[in-house]
Amino acid sequence: VFYNPAMSGSRTRSVLLLRHALEEGFLGEGTVYALDGLTASGLRARRWLNELPHEDAERISATIVDLEEDALRWAEASHDEFPPNGGTLEAAKGDLRSVVLRSGRHWVDIDPYGSPMPFIDSAMQSMARSGVMEVSATDTAALTGSSSTALMRRYGARVSTDSLAHDSGMRVMLANFSRVAARHDRAIVPLLSVWDSHHLRVSFRVLKSVSTANELE
């Protein structure tokens, strides 16, 4: 089962941001339907349930998604061996692009190997009226302009390969996600953007709002 220790900081930030979103009311007042796509070890979702305060963890209904049955079996066994602080965990085997559409989601995490773009449209369609998405990208050569053809092909953009290239890459990600959101009468509000070693990661609110989507330039 794949486990990446280099992403431990990313998982920690995810727990902190989820707690902030709950405290600020970004995710409504009832059950929070959260999805950890491309989950592998399932550790990110398990940390949500184990490290949030009990009253927050109890609100989380987490789904972990992976194509590998062995990974999901391992994640479920670990979950059973080390019971969470609250909430529920469900495993779903399949392609994230179809599984995410089975239910509305308040929180979606997408952490692929390479570009996240193949998953964004279906994930955006699944979002509740107010929710949060966290998206990683490891195709940093493209996003920072080192591979300009891949950048244009995947993201339809050009950037300067200078000291601000990683910042530019995160802006390219957000611009693409904003356009996808607008196609589904939604708008995004950036919350956190991070360049961490081998990957770029952006976190943003997703709001159902035709009027705000119309302001896209």
What are these language model-derived features?
Residues 1-217:
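SAM-dependent transferase fold signal centered on methyltransferase-like domains
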